Amino acid sequence: MTTATISLSTLQASRPSVAARADAAARWRVADVEALYALPFMDLLFQAQQVHRAHFDANEVQLSTLLSIKTGGCAEDCGYCPQSAHFDTAVEASKLMPIDEVLDAANAAKAQGATRFCMGAAWRSPKERDMERVTEMVREVRALGLETCMTLGMLDGEQARELKDAGLDYYNHNLDSAPDFYGQVISTRTYQDRLDTLGNVRDAGINVCCGGIVGMGESRTQRAGLIAQLANLSPYPESVPINNLVPVPGTPLADAEPIDPFEFVRTIAVARITMPTTMVRLSAGREQMDEALQALCFAAGANSIFYGDKLLTTSNPQAARDRALFERLGLRVQGERPAVRTSDN
């Protein structure tokens, strides 16, 4: 039997159950994840929707807002990133944003319905002189009643503990791709560097936000390899952002061929099935997706988005457009009370 013709019942019998995944010895094999990808599209979405409904309200979406608190000039050579100092892009380097400007953005995000505020700095890793300011940002944003998330590059154990002591709820550090594709995109930071940072974050008691990027030229097997890596983290991340590559002029991936839209939906569904209780977040690339494709992603188990007009340096759908889509799909925003409808009759 080939993976292309494997039945749903056979796959369910062979792959680790949710209960078995609680055992650290139980792991997703890349072949099993690839077999999920190979299911008929409707079968895959049906299974993903079943898993989703078992753990979440299928008609609820969580909103996160992402702010670049330090843009450009990064020493890393990530081939997808316009903030890298290695590439000639339109991004201008900036210094770390003043705390009052961060708080203005956080208040605006909260007013628009975001429940989590993510702050990103284009660093290889934060310097000690910056830690006092970023920890103060965490404390001040948290005081507004928002969940806090940061992505600052690599962290050592002490830095992770400082962020935890400040009250940081989530730390984002993506794996980006499968190990066997990673070297084609990045040379200045190893895969193990990323895993070490995730370990430091876990050890400090901070929730992990970790995902990857599809559409960089990887194969389906390599997409399955990324999902397997994420699902086999012990435990798997509380949040998994799935990014659809936004090709940026001046970067090595500027001319990358776009991924098939149904393959992107399959990636969302496979992430949901392999990581049943995680928040699967639609991240970069939504501006290039039509509403029908986004609706399929929600049906496949996505239950979070980055909300707001900009993601670091790339565009994002306007908040009003997202709200209109939620209304048409009957999706409720997490943390908001349903609107009370009145009638003139």
Curated annotation (Swiss-Prot):
It comes from the Bacteria. Residues 59-286 form the Radical SAM core domain. Keywords: 2Fe-2S, 4Fe-4S, Biotin biosynthesis, Iron, Iron-sulfur, Metal-binding, S-adenosyl-L-methionine, Transferase. SUPFAM superfamilies: Radical SAM enzymes. CDD domains: Radical_SAM. Signal peptide: none annotated. InterPro entries: Aldolase_TIM (IPR013785), BATS_dom (IPR010722), Biotin_synth/BioAB (IPR002684), Biotin_synthase (IPR024177), Elp3/MiaA/NifB-like_rSAM (IPR006638), rSAM (IPR007197). Gene3D superfamilies: Aldolase class I (3.20.20.70). Pathway: Cofactor biosynthesis; biotin biosynthesis; biotin from 7,8-diaminononanoate: step 2/2. GO terms for molecular function: 2 iron, 2 sulfur cluster binding; 4 iron, 4 sulfur cluster binding; biotin synthase activity; iron ion binding. Binds 1 [4Fe-4S] cluster. The cluster is coordinated with 3 cysteines and an exchangeable S-adenosyl-L-methionine. The keyword Iron-sulfur applies. It catalyses: (4R,5S)-dethiobiotin + (sulfur carrier)-SH + 2 reduced [2Fe-2S]-[ferredoxin] + 2 S-adenosyl-L-methionine = (sulfur carrier)-H + biotin + 2 5'-deoxyadenosine + 2 L-methionine + 2 oxidized [2Fe-2S]-[ferredoxin]. Its cofactor is [4Fe-4S] cluster; [2Fe-2S] cluster. It is an enzyme of class 2 (transferase). One of its GO terms (biological process) is biotin biosynthetic process. Its EC number is 2.8.1.6. [2Fe-2S] cluster binds at residues 118, 149, 209, 281. PROSITE patterns: RADICAL_SAM (PS51918). Belongs to the radical SAM superfamily. Biotin synthase family. Catalyzes the conversion of dethiobiotin (DTB) to biotin by the insertion of a sulfur atom into dethiobiotin via a radical-based mechanism. This is Biotin synthase. It comes from Leptothrix cholodnii (strain ATCC 51168 / LMG 8142 / SP-6) (Leptothrix discophora (strain SP-6)).
